[in-house]
Structures are given as C-alpha cells and as structure tokens.
C-alpha cells in the first residue's frame, strides 16, 4: 500500500486499501503454540449523579463517558475454534464525582455478571451501552468486573468498513482491529481515545494456536491442551489500539538497539502461507531508528508486526505491533511505525483531529522516500498540489472541520494533512519545523492532544502568527493559495 495507492481515491487508504506486496529477510527462531479455551438512558441525576452515557466526541457522541477515567483494564479471555469466547474484564477507574450509575460500551455478547468494588451490581443494556447500577454509590477510585460470553460481532463503520472482532481462518481464529470504535465488540470499555489506560491481557487458546497482542509479551503458559498468552501494556493506550490476533502463526523473536542504546525485543507473528516476510521484518529496526532521529526516542518497550490475510483491506497501527492485511510494502511499514509516536503515544482527544495521526504518518512516508532516492518532500508536495485542482474532492471537507464520520478516513486527513505539514515546514523553516515535531512528541508523550494545541506550539517555536495559515490549510474546505 504505497502512498500513491492510498491516495488514488478521496477515501484514503491506509485503512481502506489492501496492503501491497512486499519483499521478505531476517528471521530468528520460532516460538510455538498457545492454547485456547472458549473462552438506557440513566435515571434523572441527583447530587450523586448518574454518569453521562456519552463523552463529547464530535463524530461519535454516543461513545464513551466523560464522568470517570479508566486507569487499567485486566482482560481474561478464552477462545475456542468455534469462534466463541468466555471472558472477564476488570477495570480500575476513578469517578470524577459520586455516581449512582455509569455506563460502558459493549456491542453484542451476553453479560453474565457485574461486580463493582466486589459487590454484585445491577445492569441493563441499551443499544451498545452496558448500564451499571452499583449496590453503593461510587466515589473516587473504584473497580468493576464484567463476566460475559458469546460469539463476538464485527462492527461496520459509517464508511462501510469492518472493524472490531474480525473472524479469520473460517472462524477458527480472529484478529482485533478496532479503529475507530470496534473495541466494544470484544470487551466492555470506555470507548473514547481520550480515556487511555494500561492493559493486562491473558488470552487462552487451544495449543495449536498462537496469540499476538499489543504491549509486551510476559509469558506463555501451557496447561491441559491449552496455552495462555499474557500481554501487558504498561503505557497509556487508547481502547482502539488494544489488539489480539489468534491464529496458527510462525512467531519470530529478535532484538534491536535504539538510537539511545536501549535494547528492544521484537516479536512478529506471520501467517505461514505468506512466507517469512523477512525483508519487512528486517526493516523494523531501520525504520524505528530512522524515525527516532526525526521524532525522538521510540516511546514503547517492544516492537514487531502481525502479517495476516484478514480480508479487511487495511493495515492498523495497533500499539507496539502493527497489523498488516497481507505482506506490506516499505512505505506502509514506515507509515504504521510513525503512528507509534503520532497516534499511539500522542493520541487524539477528538476523532475530528484524525489528521494529527494520519497526516503525520503520511508525512513520515514522504521523509523516508526523500531519504531513500525518491523526490524531496517539497517536490512531493508540489506534485500533489498541482495535480489536485480546486474542484478535487481532496479539498473538502477540511481536515480539522468535518462532521460526517464516514469521512474519518478520507484523504483530507492523510494527503492534505501531510501537505499541511510540508506547507508549515516551508513557512517556518526546516530547523523550527523539526523542533515542532520532536517537541510535540515529547511534550505530549502518552497523552492526548487537539489541533489548537499544535497550532499554539507551532507559533511558540516559530515566533510567527500562524492563525491565517492554519485556517487556510485545516479549517476551510477549499484549496489553499500558496504564498
């Protein structure tokens, strides 16, 4: 999925176009198998309030809640090759005020029992909300455990794409790809990127299967024809970036040194019929070090890739370990790794700011291409600017001002987002531009951001008034004039 492929249509394609062919040469020992086992509107608020069912996201206002912050998710999930799961998710959270009830996002699945602070709680379902009424009003820090089972559904996005729980291997496997809201198909959660948390996932499968995950691999425990894979994410992670992928994989383990000398384990999971994918695996250390020199230190403790024909037609930057639908090309690899800085460590507050993810990752492709015999970023910018007339769909809607969630993965976030960054570079100069990129990654590491924050940083570093510049490039649905 090269940059050109992704920008053929207005509906940009890192997420919407099948991964392209690649090249394949590094490999270190196989691991082996894992095991598996199958696993309404609130009452009228009083002084002790019912938690809002919604977090104020402009594109997905029905998702998430703003009345509490989740600190950690502990997920125990058993999977059977029938496609059924049996699971328990325990979350630790902090209520922002006393709550008589609160809600989590959950699509499909059958809830068996809910406990809050160790006591059985009442619950009900409304649309994709699990509404929980504790036996006692929740104050401050609290825990909630939800036991559930069933066959997870696949969520259909507003643009028609699939996300969430994706059955593979004829239903005998599965891969989780949750951007933007698919996380609710496999565990109950506060499904908004503004509420990041740490994760501890224990996934039990039949011993003939392996489990890839986001985070760091802590253990693989064998027991009675099953294996339990434990993946721990010690850093803040948005719910859509939590990933598991269950299949018959070849597992490759190696290590690398970052530019700061840190030793980084690399765990990659490759579908056997796709070969060893050696070239793209070998490229991981090179890409990470390349991006470190431009964006700052790699923000996580491990790396790797998952290469699997999922049939969804897109790759996703799941934290630590991107997932590719088939063997990726170099630029797709570069794109997904750039997201570890911009999107995963530095995360959105509101989905309307998706350009802060996709524009940055697309610009990383331009940088890589320019450093490896391709056109300069200025040449790429000019080519794209000249080849898209004022009537082209690229220019509408604006990257940071649209209201249709079906436009979330349109080219305004990818291509026009990258063009905005190059235009900024030409406006403030390369020196200040790269200070802005590195400061953005450092200042907001593991946090959440908005477009106005990026504008303020750019003005502070450059000493320029950039209001008119950013208004033209990000907020007006028309082709910006070049100064």
Predicted regions located by residue number:
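Glycine/proline-rich low-complexity spacer/linker segments in large multi-domain proteins
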Residues: 138, 148-199
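Surface-exposed beta-strand/loop patches in extracellular or lumenal glycoproteins
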Residues: 88-109, 187-191, 199-206, 452
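A surface-exposed beta-strand-loop module
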Residues: 106-167
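Hydrophobic helix-coil surface modules that form long, contiguous segments used
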Residues: 87, 192-334, 363
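Amphipathic alpha-helical substructures
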Residues: 410-483
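N-terminal, polar/Ser/Thr-rich
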Residues: 2-7, 15-86, 169-171
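Second-shell loop/turn segments in exported
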Residues: 131-135, 188, 270-279, 322-323, ...
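Zinc-dependent metallopeptidase catalytic helix centered on the HExxH motif
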Residues: 194, 320-383
């Amino acid at each position: 999925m090269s940059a050109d492929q992704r920008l053929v249509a207005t509906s940009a394609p890192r997420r919407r176009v099948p991964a392209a062919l690649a090249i394949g040469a590094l490999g270190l020992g196989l691991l082996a198998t894992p095991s598996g086992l199958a696993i309404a509107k609130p009452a009228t608020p009083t002084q002790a309030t019912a938690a809002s069912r919604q977090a104020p996201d402009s594109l997905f206002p029905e998702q998430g809640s703003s009345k509490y912050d989740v600190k950690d998710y502990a997920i125990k999930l058993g999977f059977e090759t029938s496609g059924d799961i049996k699971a328990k998710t325990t979350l630790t959270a902090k209520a922002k005020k006393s709550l008589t009830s609160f809600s989590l996002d959950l699509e499909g699945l059958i809830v068996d029992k809910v406990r809050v602070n160790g006591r059985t709680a009442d619950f009900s379902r409304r649309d994709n909300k699990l509404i929980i009424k504790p036996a006692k009003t929740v104050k401050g820090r609290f825990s909630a455990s939800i036991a559930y089972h069933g066959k997870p559904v696949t969520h259909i996005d507003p643009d028609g794409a699939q996300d969430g729980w994706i059955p593979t291997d004829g239903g005998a496997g599965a891969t989780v790809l949750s951007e933007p809201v698919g996380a609710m198909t496999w565990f109950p959660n506060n499904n908004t990127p503004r509420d990041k948390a740490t994760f501890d996932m224990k996934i039990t499968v039949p011993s003939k299967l392996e489990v890839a995950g986001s985070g760091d691999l802590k253990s693989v425990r064998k027991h009675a024809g099953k294996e339990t894979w434990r993946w721990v994410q010690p850093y803040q992670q948005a719910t859509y970036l939590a990933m598991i992928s269950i299949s018959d994989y070849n597992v490759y383990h190696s290590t690398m040194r970052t530019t700061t000398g840190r030793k980084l384990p690399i765990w990659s999971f490759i579908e056997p019929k796709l070969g060893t994918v050696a070239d793209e695996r070998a490229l991981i250390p090179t890409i990470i070090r390349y991006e470190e020199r431009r964006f700052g230190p790699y923000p996580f403790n491990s790396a790797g890739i998952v290469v699997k024909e999922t049939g969804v037609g897109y790759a996703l930057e799941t934290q630590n370990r991107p997932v590719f639908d088939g063997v990726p090309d170099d630029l797709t690899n570069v794109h997904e790794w750039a997201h570890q800085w911009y999107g995963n460590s530095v995360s959105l507050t509101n989905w309307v700011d998706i350009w802060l993810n996709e524009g940055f990752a697309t610009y990383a492709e331009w940088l890589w291409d320019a450093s490896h015999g391709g056109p300069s970023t200025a040449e790429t910018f000019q080519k794209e600017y000249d080849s898209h007339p004022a009537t082209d769909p690229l220019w509408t809607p604006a990257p940071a001002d649209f209201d249709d969630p079906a436009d979330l993965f349109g080219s305004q976030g990818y291509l026009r987002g990258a063009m905005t960054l190059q235009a900024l570079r030409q406006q403030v100069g390369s020196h200040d531009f790269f200070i802005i990129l590195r400061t953005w990654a450092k200042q907001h590491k593991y946090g959440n951001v908005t477009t106005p924050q990026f504008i303020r940083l750019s003005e502070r570093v450059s000493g320029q008034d950039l209001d008119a510049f950013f208004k033209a490039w990000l907020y007006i649905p028309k082709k910006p004039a070049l100064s």
